[in-house]
Regions:
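Catalytic Walker B motif of ABC-type/P-loop ATPase nucleotide-binding domains
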Residues: 160-163
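Conserved ABC ATPase "signature" region
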Residues: 98, 113-131
């Protein structure tokens, strides 16, 4: 994955500015920044929902030429709190998951037995097959989020985009979700994870990208990026970064 000199406009406003970034097939990235720094726009650029202007380029999966967006999206799963709030169609759990085959909100065609089987396999992998026949609207917030993760998996995505996926989850549900991500990473799924909570950066993540005012503030290996000075400057706040049990935690204010 490679982005070169990307300027991205949304509604006439320049959100991303001269952005350069690349990701190899063995890396998982966490993307950190305050609200309004362009994190979600960055994810939509990677997913192909937005395109750069003025000669900016996006290359997916090593392809140097043009590649149909339909092929790109078959290889990318996308989960976000925003998408969850937009999925308002009446549907059972398995139907929501199966809609991932069509990249649609709701089912707009017949589902083959093979497609249905893949949907059930995805739910089983995440341990949520018990939600197969539960109406989506009756699920808890955390259950619905995990259903959408299963939906993103039906294409056997090689890259998973997770845009603040733990927003609104309580601590036990969040930890279950994060443990699922670790499991997926061990199975070979690569991830880009947007957050402003560093405790969500699991051991599987290898690199960190900081966005600030629509630009790359700093990027590199996680061990070099996760420190008090860098995080404080990136978020314009005095923050102490600590590490415990291979996870990072933030506290407001510097240690004296």
């Amino acid at each position: 994955m490679q982005i070169k000199n990307a300027d991205v406009y949304v509604g006439g406003n320049k959100i991303l500015k001269s952005l350069n970034w690349s990701m190899s097939e063995e890396e998982n990235w966490a993307v950190i920044g305050n609200n309004g720094t362009g994190k979600t726009t960055f994810m939509k650029l990677i997913f192909g929902e937005l395109i750069p202007v003025y000669g900016g380029k996006v290359r997916w999966f090593g392809n140097k030429g043009r590649i149909p967006l339909s092929e790109v999206r078959e290889k990318i799963g996308y989960v976000s709190a925003e998408y969850q709030s937009n999925y308002d169609r009446p549907a059972l759990g398995w139907e929501v998951v199966a809609s991932g085959h069509f990249s649609s909100i709701g089912l707009h065609g017949d589902v083959t037995q093979k497609q249905k089987g893949v949907a059930f396999d995805s739910m089983s992998y995440l341990g949520i097959e018990y939600l197969s026949y539960t109406p989506y609207r009756q699920m808890s917030y955390g259950e619905a989020r995990r259903i959408l993760l299963a939906r993103a998996m039906v294409h056997r995505a090689s890259l998973m985009i997770l845009d603040e996926p733990c927003t609104g989850l309580d601590i036990p549900t969040r930890e279950t979700f994060l443990e699922t991500m670790e499991k997926m990473s061990r199975k070979g799924t690569r991830m880009i994870y947007v957050t402003h909570r560093i405790e969500e950066i699991m051991p599987c993540f290898t690199h960190v990208l900081y966005l600030k005012n629509g630009k790359v503030f700093k990027q590199g290996r996680k061990e070099a990026m996760m420190n008090t000075k860098t995080l404080s400057r990136a978020l314009d706040c005095s923050i102490t970064v600590e590490k415990n049990f291979n996870r990072y935690y933030a506290a407001i204010g510097y240690k004296k």
